[in-house]
A protein has these predicted regions:
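Class I SAM-dependent methyltransferase SAM/SAH-binding core
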Residues: 66-124
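Conserved class I S-adenosyl-L-methionine
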Residues: 2-61, 80, 182
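A short acidic, Gly/Pro-enriched loop at the edge of an enzyme's catalytic core
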Residues: 123-134
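Core SAM-dependent methyltransferase catalytic element
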Residues: 207-246
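C-terminal alpha-helical "lid/dimerization" subdomain adjacent to the S-adenosyl-L-methionine
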Residues: 16, 25, 35-41, 165-223
């Protein structure tokens, strides 16, 4: 990501504010948010920015195709990015109308006219096969109750040759994070087991996609991968079958 785009995104973040607790935590930008990032995730602001930049690296800076973001959450992570993508056709979906409402407000504040918002379930996406050039998922898969359905639906709506990129929590990378997830976040209903490990996620993605790039920053895995132009018809079924045998 070049400096011009970074400056544009940073400027947009100032417009959206992000001064509530959730936005401050997810961006590690407020005093309370930085405290949570350090305590729960063992991360500082630079590390939070690093995994997000890697997760977004699958989106070309001149992107003008169709992009699906699921879940969009409050939009604090992506509305500023979308401000730099005026030619893109963007669809944002979230199961929570409250979260999505906050994203819509941010889009309105930034005068974004190329975004459509839908309330819905990632396990049953209301889109035709091969609709999107890119599917982006930031910090969502660890919360999805039916992760197999989510993987299947993302694969289905992505065009052959399209990019799937994003990030989410993986277990086994940071002990303190694992403890908080198990004892606090699960009980609060924010996270839903089972969780991927970094190696398990890489294996899963490599069975479904090609050109898989994956890394971790503490307990967060980021990834970028591409759906084959002519994918094997049984690639998804094979991946699911092997996962069930484990």
């Amino acid at each position: 990501m070049n400096m011009e785009r970074k400056d544009a995104i940073r400027s947009a973040y100032r417009i959206t504010g992000g001064n509530n607790f959730y936005d401050g935590m997810i961006t590690c930008s407020t005093l309370s948010g930085k405290a949570v990032c350090r305590l729960v995730w063992g991360m500082n602001k630079a590390e939070c920015d690093a995994y997000l930049e890697k997760a977004l690296s699958g989106i070309p800076e001149d992107f003008s195709g169709k992009l699906l973001e699921v879940p969009v959450g409050t939009g604090i992570l992506t509305m500023p990015v979308y401000k730099t993508m005026p030619k893109a056709n963007i669809t944002c979906l979230d199961y929570s109308p409250d979260m999505m409402g906050q994203a819509q407000e941010k889009a309105s504040h930034l005068n974004l006219n190329n975004i459509t918002f839908h309330q819905g379930d990632v396990g049953a996406l209301p889109y035709a096969d091969g609709t999107f050039d890119i599917v982006l998922s930031l910090n969502g898969f660890h919360a999805f109750p039916d992760k197999d359905a989510a993987y299947r639906e993302v694969f289905r709506v992505l065009k052959p040759g399209g990019t799937f990129c994003g990030c989410f929590y993986v277990t086994g990378e940071h002990k303190r994070t694992d403890w908080f997830v198990r004892h606090i976040y699960e009980k609060a209903g924010f996270f839903t087991p089972p969780y991927e490990t970094a190696s398990g996620l890489k294996n899963r993605l490599e069975k479904m996609y090609t050109a898989v790039t994956l890394g971790t920053v503490k307990g967060i895995a980021w990834f970028v991968c591409r759906k084959e132009v002519k994918p094997k018809s049984d690639s998804l079924d094979q991946a699911e079958s092997e996962d069930k045998e484990k």
